[in-house]
Amino acid sequence: MSTFVNDTVEDAIKTPELDQPFEALGLKDDEYARIKEILGRRPTDAELTVYSVMWSEHCSYKSSKVHLRYFGETTTEEMASKILAGIGENAGVVDIGDGNAVTFRVESHNHPSFVEPHQGAATGIGGIVRDIMAMGARPIAVMDQLRFGALDNPDTQRVLPGVVDGISHYGNCLGLPNIGGETVFDDSYAGNPLVNALCVGTLKVEDLKLAFASGTGNKVILFGSRTGLDGIGGVSVLGSASFEEGEERKLPAVQVGDPFAEKVLIECCLELYKAGVVVGIQDLGGGGLACATSELAAAGDGGMRVNLDNVPLRAENMSAAEILASESQERMCAVVTPENVERFLEICAKWDVTCAEIGEVTDEKDRYVVVHNGEVVIDAPPSTIDEGPVYNRPVARPENQDELQLEGEIARPVDVEDIKAAWLKLVASPALASRAFITEQYDRYVRGNTVQAKNANAGVLRIDEETNRGVAISADASGRYTKLEPNTGAQLALAEAYRNVVSTGARPVAVTNCLNFGSPENAGVMWQFKEAVHGLADGSKLLGIPVSGGNVSFYNQTGDEPILPTPVVGVLGVLDNVEQSIGNVLPSEDNDLYLLGETFDEFGGSIWQQVSGAGLNGLPPVVDLLNEQRLADLFVGSDLFAASHDLSEGGLGQTLAELAIHADKGMDVDLSQIHPSLFTSLFAESASRIVVATNRGEELEKRAAELGVPVFKLGRTNDSAVIAVKGADVEFNISVEELREAWTNTLPEAFGHAVGANAVVG
């Protein structure tokens, strides 16, 4: 038993005027006053801890709720019918037919990854995997979305190698393939990198599990790793003498992950589900046991009583506040009927997973009682803990937005040598260069069900070995576009992820997101956020695919300067037969090349604008989601295409270069019909475009015309190892080997000798 002296509910009643460090825990004056009003007294130390954790921006979404409701308002009945579990659950779950369901979610672990890159990123993977486990699913793959400062920034040199190592270590040890992602470099992320992790899992429809505690007398069981002192510095639980006896205890603010413990926990959970001994389940992530138990209680039909004396600990003399707020990894919390407790414990013992009965569901509706050292340290309504405050913060379009949207001058090469130099500069730029330095550290094919991953438009996975049914997943974002016009920027991210999935032949069925923004106390940031949410919600409605869930990460800034607003959008698609999915590697035999979609002189927020040294300005490309739907109608179920590659950053030039490099093929292309300007044809970033390879051109042209998809014949592939380009009045050749050398060397040269990589911020 702990020797820590508790601040009990009885003490709180006797000492109403005791000063408490609520500000150090992130609570505002009015929030502290509201807690006292709810309880009818001052909170105990443990209650103050729980409310501060659960009312944090991370757990409560207090600044974003008013805007996130728009997702629900724009979801039609038809869209909702596809979702088995949606916004508010640990992850979205989609019914894909034949009794199968897929669950997926993306979440941020930004600030921990800056402080301690390896563990921050590793536990980001661990946390999102447990979200998927908590839905009753087997995790089958991960993806990542990474943002760093400039390539030569010392912080980037320190953080990136550690982040990549953390992701690869944890994911590889779990045996989960990393099937895709995106890495972006921009000055705005210096000092505040973004580490967003996505996980996808599969389950049978009838095996779906939800996070709620119901059934009076049912037991609450904590299982997994023991609870320690790691991961609680971030919520400032021990920021004052009121919460700590002595200063010798040094607490890591970043959680420490054990992927092998999580691997065992996955198998243990799946056997528990199969045995039918789980009523409700919740993973322990941000907010730890405080979050898991109070959320279970709030979602249930009764109350809950928790005894912290039964929690397996790995540190001595832990206070109630420490036990509740600890974010030790690899832990789950389940609700189990009394008759199934013995079987539950047997299964945990089989897998050598530590477990303990720590509480029970009571018949006292909306009452959450926590006991430590035999004393009551929390007695509060769980609904008030879980719901948190709701803020409608000021929203104001930034004063400089009009000026930002004015189109500035950019260099526009005309002669052959300048165009070739521009092309090589683009493919070698940090924005577009090969990510093999990163992705080769990930195992993409473990488990044997990865169909597409390396250099693919979208990750493609087989989920049913008998039918070859599978899914395609892509996640995309553009902070540059979103900075210029947040509504359009979010829709462009949605359009690109949708198009990536479509280009494999998959039918898009659902959306997830992770919205990374600056401080919500900045009215300009809140305007960006609101506009992005509306753009994403309206776009999803137009495409007819529901937003199944998401995550919000605020306070991403260095000093007063926020990051580029970065709404990461993930799209899930379904393939009836993954063996018929369309890849993006040109076949060895020669094929005709076609460009689908129109090209306009659109360079606002483009990579050429960035690489050429022009400031970020102008308007992003126009997005017409009906054009994306037309492309979907052309691709889904079609056997016309030998290969496909969507166009996005870097435009047609980047796509042609990657196609040639990956297949070691040459090509003759005539761009005179694409746009009068060869420069625009190559480097503009207009949306709704895909390059395809086919030898059934007449059929393609006919079908595209029927659907209203603009189609332009570019030329044909060959074995020359040269891209021969023809414009309206310009012709030139560029060597594939020259492009390859430019494309492949940038990241290895930058990080081959990264000094201080993965150093911890003190």
From Swiss-Prot:
Name assigned to this protein: Phosphoribosylformylglycinamidine synthase subunit PurL
First-listed, main subcellular location of the protein, grouped into a coarse class: cytoplasm
Recorded metabolic or biological pathway in which this protein acts: Purine metabolism; IMP biosynthesis via de novo pathway; 5-amino-1-(5-phospho-D-ribosyl)imidazole from N(2)-formyl-N(1)-(5-phospho-D-ribosyl)glycinamide: step 1/2
Catalytic center residues: 58, 109 (proton acceptor)
Binding-site residues for ATP, renumbered to this chain: 61, 105, 513, 550
HAMAP family assigned to the protein according to its UniProt record, in alphabetical order: PurL_2
Gene name of the encoded protein: purL
GO MF annotation, one: ATP binding
Assembly with partners or alone: Monomer. Part of the FGAM synthase complex composed of 1 PurL, 1 PurQ and 2 PurS subunits.
Binding-site residues for Mg(2+) 1, renumbered to this chain: 107, 551
